[in-house]
């Protein structure tokens, strides 16, 4: 049996931009992506701690070291710059494998979105 489990999590990063006129997605600083074991094009679930919104989109690689967390397209309507969000991705795996799997969870400094 296959189940879906948490694979990666960026816990409490700050939204730096919201670009309604861009073609959808979330742009994430490449340093944060690497730390969380996330890749460009990966589907992510986003939770906004400030307003309770929950939505899905996919990742676009942002400039390394920039601290960028930018919601693009329609998702830009779900957040405000300065909001604190949690970004999660999931993986399908065998039930037995999932029992011992440990997700990558990253707690960046939310003031600057930097790895501490």
UniProtKB/Swiss-Prot annotation:
It is found in: Cytoplasm. InterPro entries: Asp_de-COase-like_dom_sf, Asp_decarbox. The active site is at residues 25, 58. Its EC number is 4.1.1.11. Pathway: Cofactor biosynthesis; (R)-pantothenate biosynthesis; beta-alanine from L-aspartate: step 1/1. One of its GO terms (molecular function) is aspartate 1-decarboxylase activity. The keyword DNA damage does not apply. Keywords: Autocatalytic cleavage, Cytoplasm, Decarboxylase, Lyase, Pantothenate biosynthesis, Pyruvate, Schiff base, Zymogen. Transmembrane segments: none annotated. Its main location: cytoplasm. The keyword Lyase applies. Is synthesized initially as an inactive proenzyme, which is activated by self-cleavage at a specific serine bond to produce a beta-subunit with a hydroxyl group at its C-terminus and an alpha-subunit with a pyruvoyl group at its N-terminus. It catalyses: L-aspartate + H(+) = beta-alanine + CO2. Binds 1 pyruvoyl group covalently per subunit. Gene3D superfamilies: 2.40.40.20. CDD domains: Asp_decarbox (cd06919). GO terms for cellular component: cytosol. NCBIfam families: panD (TIGR00223). Catalyzes the pyruvoyl-dependent decarboxylation of aspartate to produce beta-alanine. Belongs to the PanD family. Heterooctamer of four alpha and four beta subunits. This is Aspartate 1-decarboxylase. It comes from Phocaeicola vulgatus (strain ATCC 8482 / DSM 1447 / JCM 5826 / CCUG 4940 / NBRC 14291 / NCTC 11154) (Bacteroides vulgatus).
């Amino acid at each position: 049996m296959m189940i879906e489990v948490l694979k990666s999590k960026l816990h409490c990063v700050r939204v730096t931009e919201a670009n309604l006129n861009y073609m959808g997605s979330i742009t994430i600083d490449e340093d944060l992506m690497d730390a969380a074991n996330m890749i460009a094009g990966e589907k992510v679930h986003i939770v906004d701690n400030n307003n309770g919104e929950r939505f899905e989109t996919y990742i676009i690689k942002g400039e390394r070291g920039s601290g960028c967390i930018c919601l693009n397209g329609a998702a830009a309507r779900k957040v405000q710059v300065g909001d604190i969000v949690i970004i999660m991705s999931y993986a399908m795996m065998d039930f037995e494998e999932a029992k011992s799997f440990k997700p990558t969870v990253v707690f960046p400094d939310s003031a600057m979105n930097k790895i501490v």
